[in-house]
Regions:
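N-terminal Rossmann NAD(P)H-binding glycine-rich loop of SDR-like oxidoreductase domains
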Residues: 3-22
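NAD(P)H-binding glycine-rich loop region in Rossmannoid oxidoreductase-like domains
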Residues: 53-92
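A conserved pocket-lining segment of Rossmann-fold NAD(P)-dependent short-chain dehydrogenase/reductase
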Residues: 83, 168-178, 188-212, 216
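Conserved Rossmann-fold NAD(P)-dependent oxidoreductase catalytic core, especially the SDR/UDP-sugar
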Residues: 98-140
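Conserved beta-loop-beta element that borders a ligand/cofactor-binding pocket
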Residues: 116-117, 149-175
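Flexible, glycine-rich beta-alpha linker
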Residues: 122, 139-140, 164-183
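Glycine/proline-rich active-site loop of Rossmann-fold NAD(P)-dependent oxidoreductases
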Residues: 146, 159, 172-187, 214-215, ...
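C-terminal substrate-binding subdomain of Rossmann-fold SDR/epimerase-dehydratase oxidoreductases
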Residues: 202-205, 209-320
């Protein structure tokens, strides 16, 4: 199978590319960054096309030339970056998504898999949120992702494109996502604890939010892509692995690095964005329809992310 990944050099994309190449797929990466955030021997086998999804001509030409069987559309400006640069966010998240969908239809691509977010739900909705919960986001990032979901459904209804997507909880990984996610603290905590011995949260310790380990996200994307369409009741599915408080995340690190110094100074912009998101996601549909389950809970993902960070420090030059 031949696959194109937009945002394929990013946190999720670089691991997804490696996973697909490992199983024998041919991968084309379209990304403004040519160097992967998570380098692997497998990623070096991907074909790299530098550029952004907001460049319509480039997207149309890249998809037409590559003729992929499927597209994983991951490229986006994230929540924190969206509030700082609304115009670019509109171009990348809205026009970019439309460019990808148009290119897919024009080139006869079979399937597009899209990454959405818990930020699409907003505040004041019944919890835990499920696939039927109304989406009333309070931030621009969430608003653009709702629009992206609905565009995908439109292209499914209008053009027969097999559009599928995942709504992700806050993703835990060794590197904070490029582009300024409001939830970047769930990654920064671990890196700063290992490298600096201290971390200052910009949200409240009582804040609760669904989290998910990056490799569980990759497994979800591949699993949803490969799933029998006849078994799918939804176009977009919730993906998360638990709902710890920020204090619980900090405590999990302190248990492993007892001398780490952690404090809390909530940011007046970021903290309200994060607090507007639901504190719990119902992911039962993902399990019931296509068998996805998270392999990592909070304790396991804490162990894994600290292991990867220490391994990185032990191998200079492995990470760029």
């Amino acid at each position: 199978m031949k696959v194109l990944i937009t945002g394929g050099a990013g946190n999720i994309g670089s691991r997804l590319a490696a996973s697909l190449i490992r199983r024998g797929d041919q991968v084309v990466v379209l990304d403004v960054n040519s160097e992967p955030l998570y380098p692997t021997p497998e990623f070096s086998k991907a074909d790299i096309c530098p550029g952004g999804v907001d460049d319509r001509e480039l997207v149309m030409a890249t998809v037409a030339e590559a003729r992929p069987d499927s597209i994983f559309h991951l490229a986006a400006i994230l929540s924190g970056g969206a509030e700082k640069d609304p115009d670019r966010t509109w171009r990348v998240n809205l026009e970019g998504t439309r460019n990808v969908l148009e290119a897919a239809v024009a080139a006869g691509v079979n399937r597009v898999v899209f990454t959405s977010t818990i930020a699409t739900y907003g505040a004041g909705v019944p919890e835990p949120v499920n696939e039927h919960t109304p989406q009333w986001p309070s931030g621009l990032y969430g608003a653009t992702k709702v629009a992206g979901e609905r565009l995908g459904v439109y292209y499914h209804l209008r053009h027969g494109l097999d559009f599928r997507g995942v709504r992700l909880g806050a993703m835990v990984a060794p590197d904070a996502p490029v582009g300024g996610a409001a939830s970047a603290f769930v990654c920064e905590l671990y890196a700063q604890a290992v490298q600096c011995g201290a971390y200052r949260f910009d949200v409240y310790p009582t804040t609760q939010l669904p989290v998910v380990w990056v490799d569980d996200v990759v497994h979800a994307l591949v699993g949803l892509h490969d799933a029998d369409g006849e078994m799918l009741r939804h176009r977009v599915y919730n993906i998360a692995a638990g709902t710890p408080s920020v204090q619980a995340m900090a405590d999990a690190v302190v248990r492993r690095i007892p001398d780490v110094k952690i404090d809390f100074v909530p940011d007046p912009v970021r903290a309200p964005i994060v607090d507007s998101w639901p504190s719990a996601m119902d992911v039962s549909a993902s399990h019931d329809d296509w068998g996805w389950r998270p392999a990592f809970d909070l304790e396991q993902m804490t162990e894994q992310v600290l292991h990867e960070l220490r391994e990185r420090d032990a191998e200079p030059g492995r990470y760029i």
